Amino acid sequence: MPTPTPKKVTEIPTIDVVLVVAATESAAYALDTASEIAVEPQVEEEEAVRLVVKGKLKAQKQKVSTITGNQITLTDNVFSPELVQMLQGGTIKYWQEAGQETEGTEDKGFGVSSYTPPTVGSGIHGSVFTLRAYSAQYDTSGQIVRYECIEYPNCQGVPVAFASEDGAFRAPEYTINSAPKSDEAPYKITYVSTLPSVS
């Protein structure tokens, strides 16, 4: 059988973590301060089976790998209480006036006064959300021509820990597990001309 003539592949060079959006049905939060997203596929493996008779391989069944989701590690450069609340639950309180003397749960534009995680053993978890990570595609003139969006479904965060050191701004790492539903892809890549608007 003749070999088909090779066709040049589509080349899509992307760079940077331009924007990250975490969205539930009732809220969406955008981060333009994230510096890295590492994704590790979660794979269940069925080991290979080989029939070896007197030192000779007679037959074999290849190893089967099944993807069950992705573990996403998001490195941010600032603390984002709204994202942390989405990841692990808890309560955010806001200053209710410019003098910053009274706390409340309504954001009136005077800033965050506190974040408290769920109590130990409460069984409270964060929300299930969709994560969209945007990267930029540049042309040879150095201009952005469009954006790549990778969407991960059914994301849930794990409890967050914080570390600090002298002379360095904190760069929190958030671990997120994404597990698709039955007949759902573990991620989807789309290309868009503009980023979503952020208020």
Language-model-derived ranges and their functions:
Residues 65-132:
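Extracellular-facing segments of soluble proteins and assemblies that are Gly/Ser/Thr-biased and enriched
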